[in-house]
Amino acid sequence: VAEAVNLGGVKVMVIDDSNTIRRSAEIFLVQAGCQVVLAEDGFDALAKIADHHPDIVFCDIMMPRLDGYQTCALIKKNPRFGVTPVIMLSSKDGLFDRARGRMVGSDEYLTKPFTKDSLLKAVATHLPQRVS
């Protein structure tokens, strides 16, 4: 049984071209108290990130137009979001993909399909410690 993680008020952006992945991530995160911002691809995410200021970003690698590596690099190059944790999502679990993710500044790599536990653990691990 998963312990109840309280992530109340944490703002999470999920960038994935798969509606199924976006929806399942949203359900898991909302159940834990997060505010969720969804984006269909890198361009959509870059248009929304400045308005929403997420605390953490989950970014799919394989997306049309702007892939996850390019999206992560652009987020990290922006001085306002340079310290925002970016976690790559991929159905591939290769060493090369992980290394490439690190090169563009990602903080972690989560393999799809992810579980509720692995998603929430990633959020809790990478959030700045909040004083309660």
Model-flagged regions — what are they?
Residues 114-123:
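C-terminal output helix
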Residues 23-31:
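Charged docking surfaces used in two-component/phosphorelay signaling
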Residues 52-58:
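Active-site beta3 strand of CheY-like receiver
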Residues 33-40, 48:
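Short hydrophobic/Thr-rich beta-strand motif most characteristic of the beta2 strand and flanking loop
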Residues 63:
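Receiver (REC) domain active-site loop signature in two-component systems and cognate sites
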